[in-house]
């Protein structure tokens, strides 16, 4: 015997929420793939300074997002099918998956909040090391190539310290052609550009995580209510 009345409304409401959840998983998967192949970040994070590669923490987070998006699409499909079939087993499995996903998202959110500035900090340190080598050693061709890639990709020149800014003025060959004047150099600080590049992407990820968390809470409530309704209807 199928569910009736308010429980039937909850059934279709849960189906709609799960469809939205499935779509959200697809969006997160798409955004993660876009972030993974974004030309600016790819260019910078594939650089190597001697034997030292650029920091890879950002990509670790992206790979986690790709996995989360794929799992969300699977769980969303499971919830849709379980709601339509009125299966307590599928709904129970769906609820368990949601709880695990929610716990992982909370843990990842806490870690991300604590380390939100670490990615940009690591990239800035990598840039400063390359800039220092390029300025101190005329034969440091690898370091010069790394610095030029940063400057051309982000359209900046030098860091925010007076020393590196002064040396950058003396090394116009390392800077974009539009940044030859001292006034322009003051405006085009590479540390600031690095912060803008990564903070914007992290805010985008944070907003998506909050939206998904709200949907998951509603789905957990609705799935339990529907599961109880199915159990009660089978008694009668």
Curated annotation (Swiss-Prot):
It holds the Pfam family Tetraspanin. Disulfide bonds join 156-190, 157-175. Residues 1-12, 85-89, 225-236 are cytoplasmic. Belongs to the tetraspanin (TM4SF) family. It is a multi-pass membrane protein. GO terms for cellular component: apical plasma membrane; basal plasma membrane; basolateral plasma membrane; extracellular exosome; immunological synapse; membrane; plasma membrane; tetraspanin-enriched microdomain. It is found in: Cell membrane; Basolateral cell membrane. Residues 34-63, 113-201 are extracellular. Structural component of specialized membrane microdomains known as tetraspanin-enriched microdomains (TERMs), which act as platforms for receptor clustering and signaling. Essential for trafficking and compartmentalization of CD19 receptor on the surface of activated B cells. Upon initial encounter with microbial pathogens, enables the assembly of CD19-CR2/CD21 and B cell receptor (BCR) complexes at signaling TERMs, lowering the threshold dose of antigen required to trigger B cell clonal expansion and antibody production. Binds cholesterol in a cavity lined by the transmembrane spans. The chain crosses the membrane at residues 13-33, 64-84, 90-112, 202-224. The record marks 116, 144, 148 as: Important for interaction with integrin. The lineage of its organism: Eukaryota, Metazoa, Chordata, Craniata, Vertebrata. Cholesterol binds at residue 219. One of its GO terms (biological process) is receptor internalization. It comes from Rattus norvegicus (Rat). Not glycosylated. Keywords: Adaptive immunity, Cell membrane, Disulfide bond, Immunity, Lipid-binding, Membrane, Transmembrane, Transmembrane helix. This is CD81 antigen. GO terms for molecular function: cholesterol binding; integrin binding; MHC class II protein binding; transferrin receptor binding; virus receptor activity. Homodimer. Part of a complex composed of CD19, CR2/CD21, CD81 and IFITM1/CD225 in the membrane of mature B cells. Interacts (via the second extracellular domain) with CD19; this interaction is initiated early during biosynthesis in the ER and enables trafficking of only properly folded CD19. Part of a complex that includes MHC class II/HLA-DR molecules and IFITM1. Interacts with IFITM1. Interacts with IFITM2 and IFITM3. Part of integrin-tetraspanin complex composed of CD9, CD81, beta-1 and beta-2 integrins in the membrane of monocyte/macrophages.
């Amino acid at each position: 015997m199928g569910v009736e009345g308010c429980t039937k409304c909850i059934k279709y409401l849960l189906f709609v929420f799960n469809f939205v959840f499935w779509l959200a998983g697809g969006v997160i998967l798409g955004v993660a793939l876009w972030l993974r192949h974004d030309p600016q970040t790819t260019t910078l994070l594939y650089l190597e300074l001697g034997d030292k590669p650029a920091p890879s923490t950002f990509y670790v987070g992206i790979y986690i997002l790709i996995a989360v998006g794929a799992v969300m699409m699977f769980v969303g499909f499971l919830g849709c099918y379980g709601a339509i079939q009125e299966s307590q087993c599928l709904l129970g499995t769906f609820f368990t998956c949601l709880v695990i996903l929610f716990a992982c998202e909370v843990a990842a959110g806490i870690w991300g909040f604590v380390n939100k500035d670490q990615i940009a900090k690591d990239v800035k340190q990598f840039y400063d090391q390359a800039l220092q080598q390029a300025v101190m050693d005329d034969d440091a061709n690898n370091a010069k190539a790394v610095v030029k890639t940063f400057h051309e990709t982000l359209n900046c020149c030098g860091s925010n310290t007076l020393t590196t800014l002064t040396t950058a003025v003396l090394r116009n060959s390392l800077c974009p052609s539009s940044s030859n004047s001292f006034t322009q150099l003051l405006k085009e600080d590479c540390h600031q550009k690095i912060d803008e590049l990564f903070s914007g992407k992290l805010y985008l990820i944070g907003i998506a995580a909050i939206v998904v968390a709200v949907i998951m809470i509603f789905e957990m409530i609705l799935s339990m209510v529907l599961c109880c309704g199915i159990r009660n209807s089978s008694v009668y």
